[in-house]
Amino acid sequence: MGQKTHPLGFRIGITRDHKSSWFSNIKSYPKLAQEDYKIRSCIEKQLHNASISLIYIDRKVAQVQVHIHTARPGIILGKLGRGLEDLRKKLETTLKNDTQIRINLIEITDPDKEATLIAEFIVQRLEKRIAFRRVIRQAMQRAQKAKNQGIKIQVSGRLNGSEIARIESVREGRVPLQTLRAHIDYSYKTTHTIYGILGVKYGYLKEKK
């Protein structure tokens, strides 16, 4: 039976960094790791339509800095800029401790270069019951604007309501998953439709600088 390795976890320390930055002793580590999970879950649930590609957590002595990379910062800020303060209070309530939280928004200027946002685009279109081939073609057109060396899109499930689930994939260029030095961005999303669950995988090889 084939063993699958996550393309991003496989490259941590080589071409990818961790999504959290902090140190802890053995006793405190589980608690802090769970807090990171709660922070990310709360943000993703409350701001599911804000086009967030990365939530980076940086811990200091009694302070947690949350850096949110988003293509739509206006949705997070809300009217009169109160959205950020409301989110901060929500996170502090979720953690249920005295930890001070600071939130920093980082705007994404080119969403077509973010694998997470392209995968979300595919999911949103599939939820609207648009034909999957048309959705893949639209996603490929967006991805090609980023001028990357390779693109791969895979959609699986009961596509277009077919009786038998199948996998459809499109590849352009090269996406070397076994080359650790390759700068690959990857995202996996699922969506619920009236026919069942569909899985979406999107990955691309970044252009060399």
From Swiss-Prot:
Gene Ontology annotations of biological process type: translation
Record GO terms (molecular function): rRNA binding; structural constituent of ribosome
Keyword presence, rRNA-binding: yes
Gene Ontology terms: cellular component: chloroplast; cytosolic small ribosomal subunit
KH type-2 domain segment(s): 39-109
Mitochondrion as UniProt keyword: no
One Pfam assignment: Ribosomal_S3_C
SUPFAM superfamilies: Prokaryotic type KH domain (KH-domain type II), Ribosomal protein S3 C-terminal domain
Localization annotation: Plastid, Chloroplast
Domain of life: Eukaryota
Keywords: Chloroplast, Plastid, Ribonucleoprotein, Ribosomal protein, RNA-binding, rRNA-binding
Oligomer and partners: Part of the 30S ribosomal subunit.
Similarity field: Belongs to the universal ribosomal protein uS3 family.
Annotated protein name in UniProt: Small ribosomal subunit protein uS3c
The organism of origin for this protein: Gracilaria tenuistipitata (Red alga)
Lineage summary: Eukaryota, Rhodophyta, Florideophyceae, Rhodymeniophycidae, Gracilariales
